[in-house]
């Protein structure tokens, strides 16, 4: 997908089940934006792609590929889920993540200092006197 964004739409039109992924640490955090770009590029190429289809490229379809669609990939009672609460349209570059839940636990809250991201590098480190970490 790096070179031809409408590839996802072309493959879907041909009957393939599309999944988007990235091996880049930055790219994996913005799969919603990658899905949006691929959706809009497909539309510009004349291929009808719905928002629901583009969202499935980064949710239900990857779960199906991994063989875990019976327990993950869609929001349904009894399924495991990691959920992001967005400030607006998840396909917009202006939308911000307000909260993130992993397996039902709040792990990030934009407005709560106790729920801010920490890297693995920071774990088990002693904070310097006077620092906030």
Protein language model features and the residues they cover:
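Short, surface-exposed, polar/charged, turn-prone segments marking secondary-structure boundaries
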Residues: 46-49, 111-115, 127-129
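C-terminal cap of metal-dependent C-N hydrolases
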Residues: 64, 76-120
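Short, solvent-exposed cationic patches
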Residues: 122-133
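His/Asp/Glu-enriched, well-ordered alpha-helical/loop segment
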Residues: 1-86, 106
């Amino acid at each position: 997908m790096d070179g031809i964004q409408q590839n996802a739409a072309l493959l879907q039109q041909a009957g393939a089940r599309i999944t988007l992924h990235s091996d880049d640490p930055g790219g994996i955090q913005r799969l919603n934006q990658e899905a949006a770009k691929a959706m809009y590029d497909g539309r510009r190429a004349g291929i009808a792609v719905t928002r629901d289809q583009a969202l499935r490229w980064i949710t239900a379809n990857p779960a199906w590929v991994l063989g875990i669609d019976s327990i993950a990939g869609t929001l349904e009672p009894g399924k495991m889920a990691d959920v992001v609460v967005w400030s607006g349209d998840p396909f917009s570059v202006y939308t911000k993540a307000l909260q993130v839940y992993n397996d039902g636990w709040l792990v990030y809250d934009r407005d709560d200092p106790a729920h801010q991201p920490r890297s693995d590098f920071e774990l088990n480190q002693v904070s310097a006197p006077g620092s906030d970490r």
